[in-house]
Amino acid sequence: MKPIKVLGICGSLRAASTNMGLLRFAREHAPAGMEINIAALGEVPFYNADLKQKPAAVQALLADIKQADALLLACPEYNYSLAPALKNALDWASRETDNYLLAGKPAAIMGAGGGMGTARAQYHLRQVCVFLNLHLYNKPEVFSSAFDGSYDEKGNLINEKIQGMVIEQLGALQNWVARLRS
Ligand SMILES: Cc1cc2nc3c(=O)[nH]c(=O)nc-3n(C[C@H](O)[C@H](O)[C@H](O)COP(=O)(O)O)c2cc1C
């Protein structure tokens, strides 16, 4: 079997991002048969339909999404919703012909944030994913606090319980991709 290629997309751009820490941990602990890459969003501009020639960072993002069998969306919570960098990445991808980059693609969501561990933002993101026709895996969910010591000063995930949840989610995503393929 070819390995499942998963693309991580992180809604936070800061160097010590805890959401990026979640994705890094996932990449380092991907199960056998799964490879995780992480998209570079730092240079991706806001979606603008006037940009007929797509900027290089957008082209790279779209190519990464195209080759991915599944998406792993790391979703910070900004003002009760998903962060703009993540929404912007999905907006760019959604404008390709017939939404072919996203429609039917399996995906899972994880997040690190304030009091509710990004629950509000994640459920908002799920609503967005309905329109995009991404096939989200429901459980296990990964909610975590960015402020309770679960992450070190560089944003690395150090909480063993959350680490276990991420590993469990990756296994579930792998099964989900296999089910959708069969
Ligand atoms: C503009 C802004 C709005 C935020 N609003 C919320 C919020 O509504 N709920 C919440 O739990 N955290 C909120 N936070 C805190 C973020 O969830 C927190 O900074 C999180 O760690 C960001 O992820 P990062 O570590 O990956 O950068 C907000 C942060 C910013 C910058």
Please report, for each region that a protein language model flagged, where it lies by residue.
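Helix-loop-strand module that forms the ligand-binding subsite of alpha/beta enzymes
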Residues: 56-132
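A generic structural motif
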Residues: 30-37, 135
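Glycine-rich phosphate/pyrophosphate-binding loop and the adjoining helix
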Residues: 1-2, 7, 136-182
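N-terminal beta-loop-helix "entrance" segment that forms/cooperates
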Residues: 41-57, 150-151
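N-terminal beta1-alpha1 ligand-phosphate binding loop
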Residues: 2-33
